[in-house]
Regions:
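C-terminal substrate-binding/catalytic lobe of Rossmann-fold NAD(P)-dependent oxidoreductases
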Residues: 1-106
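C-terminal helical cap and adjacent loop that interface with cofactors, partners, or active-site loops
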Residues: 81-140
Length: 140
């Protein structure tokens, strides 16, 4: 593993199945494991039914996540250092393949601070109508 990155579950990863069941059927992604202690970087691909543009996609994501204080949308591809020691999610690096109507993007989290416990707090906050970051460590 030293000085290496390894792809695993190249098709039908557990989390890919979850996203397909609950969010969007036409997503593909492959997780990778690397030598670093914390952080997850995911590259996702959506196959859309029609052509679009990056500005439209950015506007769609920004509008959808406007009330989610722990989610940040940016133009450039995010990196793990941007989320280190935070509970936030950064989504960015949007690119669109017009030949395949494929939208590609990246998402990063610090899985030690944006893990199951933080997600549980966010879910409870959402269920009771509280702000999503109530009771969660403030991001740097």
């Amino acid at each position: 593993m030293s000085d290496n990155v390894i792809a695993y579950s190249l098709v039908d990863h557990l989390h890919e199945r979850e996203v397909k069941k609950h969010c969007y059927e036409k997503i593909l992604f492959t997780p990778h494991v690397a030598e670093f202690f914390r952080g997850i970087l995911m590259t996702g691909n959506f196959f859309l039914t029609q052509s679009t543009s990056i500005p439209k996609i950015m506007q769609l994501f920004e509008t959808f996540y406007v009330n989610h204080k722990l989610i940040q949308i940016q133009t450039s591809a995010p990196n793990l250092q941007q989320v280190r020691d935070t509970s936030k999610v950064i989504i960015g690096g949007f690119e669109f393949d017009t030949k395949l109507n494929r939208l590609s993007f990246c998402c990063v989290i610090d899985n030690l601070l944006k893990g199951a416990a933080t997600q549980a707090i966010q879910n409870l906050n959402s269920a009771f109508g509280f702000e999503d970051n109530l009771g969660i460590i403030k991001s740097n």
